C-alpha cells in the first residue's frame, strides 16, 4: 500500500472515531436538536468521503468489503445538497455504518504495519 493511501486511511479512522466520541450517549433527538453537533458530524462524514475518494483503485479493489462508492456518494450528497440533508440518514450512518468501518480501517492499517 502506498503512503498516500495509508494517510487517507488514517484520516478516515480519525474522523470516524471523532464522530463516535461526539455522538456517544446522545439520542437521535438530541442529535437533531444540537445544530453544532450535527454540523460537526456532517463535516466529518465529508472528510471521510473525500479521503475515501482519494484512496487508490488498487486498494479499493483489494478491500471490496468496504463500500467505497457509498462513502464517496454520501460525501457528494452532503456537499452538494447542503440544504436538503436528511439528519435521520446522517444519524443512521453515524450509529450503524461508522462503527464497523472503524474496525475495517483499523485492520487495513494494521496489515500495513
Stretches with model-predicted labels:
Residues 1-113:
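Solvent-exposed interaction patches of small proteins and small membrane subunits
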Amino acid at each position: 500500500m502506498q503512503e498516500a493511501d495509508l494517510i487517507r486511511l488514517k484520516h478516515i479512522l480519525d474522523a470516524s472515531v471523532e464522530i463516535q466520541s461526539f455522538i456517544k450517549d446522545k439520542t437521535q433527538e438530541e442529535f437533531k436538536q444540537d445544530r453544532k453537533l450535527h454540523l460537526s458530524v456532517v463535516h466529518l462524514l465529508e472528510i471521510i468521503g473525500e479521503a475515501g475518494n482519494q484512496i487508490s483503485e488498487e486498494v479499493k479493489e483489494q478491500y471490496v468489503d468496504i463500500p467505497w462508492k457509498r462513502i464517496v456518494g454520501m460525501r457528494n450528497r452532503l456537499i452538494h445538497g447542503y440544504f436538503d440533508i436528511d439528519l435521520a440518514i446522517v444519524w443512521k450512518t453515524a450509529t450503524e455504518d461508522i462503527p464497523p468501518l472503524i474496525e475495517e480501517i483499523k485492520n487495513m492499517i494494521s496489515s500495513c504495519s
